[in-house]
Amino acid sequence: MRAPMTLKGVRRLRDELEHLKSVKRPEIINAIAEARAHGDLKENAEYHAAREQQSFIEGRIKQLEGELSHAEVIDVAKLNAGTKIVFGATVTLVDLETDEESRYQIVGDLEADIKQGLVAISSPVARALIGKQEGDTIVIEAPAGRREYEVVAVEYIS
């Protein structure tokens, strides 16, 4: 099944994959060779640590390759949805109780990072936003309780 992902998200994953393959993988191969040179592998902590790290890196490479092979890349800058909220939209919300403003971009599940304001398309926040437009009010059921927000801006920025 194809997973929607922004162009920016795909670039980030490709950069990580390239770094793992061209920098981390050779480093770990050298570390294993160096640890082997120290002799007995049964009690060689450096060797076992390097092999464990190699296993982690190879697993992450496989994971990234799989994610990228299933990505449906969407160039947000080319979307023409106007003020309607769809995948890729950057949305500015105002909490109707506190007047606090927040800004989120709706992205694919694999690229979500709430600290960077990237919310997954499958998240409760994104589900409440999809299909709405500037001026609409949304209600989000959060662990801290029910919150009401007004959509004050919708942008499509790559």
UniProtKB/Swiss-Prot annotation:
It comes from the Bacteria. One of its GO terms (molecular function) is DNA binding. GO terms for biological process: DNA-templated transcription elongation; regulation of DNA-templated transcription elongation. Residues 45-72 form a coiled coil. InterPro entries: GreA/GreB_C_sf, TF_GreA/GreB_CS, Tscrpt_elong_fac_GreA, Tscrpt_elong_fac_GreA/B, Tscrpt_elong_fac_GreA/B_C, Tscrpt_elong_fac_GreA/B_fam, Tscrpt_elong_fac_GreA/B_N, Tscrpt_elong_fac_GreA/B_N_sf. Keywords: Coiled coil, DNA-binding, Transcription, Transcription regulation. Belongs to the GreA/GreB family. Necessary for efficient RNA polymerase transcription elongation past template-encoded arresting sites. The arresting sites in DNA have the property of trapping a certain fraction of elongating RNA polymerases that pass through, resulting in locked ternary complexes. Cleavage of the nascent transcript by cleavage factors such as GreA or GreB allows the resumption of elongation from the new 3'terminus. GreA releases sequences of 2 to 3 nucleotides. HAMAP family: GreA_GreB (MF_00105). NCBIfam families: greA, PRK00226.1-2, PRK00226.1-4, PRK00226.1-5. This is Transcription elongation factor GreA. It comes from Xylella fastidiosa (strain 9a5c).
